[in-house]
């Protein structure tokens, strides 16, 4: 099965499995923007929320960057479709990019972003109409436990 990992899922997989994450995600797909989203999330957790130290954040980001060498890093092929989905579902263009890539690759979208999951589920009719198909959603726990 093919997987597109969004930043929330990739970050949670790395946090849970560390370098052992490679076994679960090798050959999966992610977007060019993913490392930046993860870096921003780690910055926020270290700087604003004080959940982790800068050292912990740096270690996690370094692990992510090493794992990215074993993933297919891609971009959506159809930017107009991406914008249309962002508009219809009222989500960010970033989030819509993950949906479009999953659709284009006939892959499952792995996300732990509750808000995104809810929007996709609530907007399934709109997605069906715009894409002509549906996108299967999974969580990082489903990947970790597989």
Which residues does each PLM region occupy?
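A general structural signal for well-ordered alpha-helical segments in protein cores
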Residues: 35, 39, 61, 79-82
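Alpha-helical elements of the RecA-like P-loop NTPase motor core of helicases
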Residues: 12, 40, 118
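Helix-adjacent hinge/juxtasegments
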Residues: 50-55, 65-76
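Short, well-structured N-terminal submotif of metal-dependent ribonuclease cores
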Residues: 1-35, 50-55
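Active-site neighborhoods of divalent-metal-dependent phosphate/nucleic-acid chemistry enzymes
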Residues: 70-119
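Short glycine/serine- and small hydrophobic-enriched flexible loop segments
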Residues: 40-47, 103-104
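Acidic, PIN/NYN-like endoribonuclease modules and their adjacent C-terminal/linker elements
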Residues: 111-146
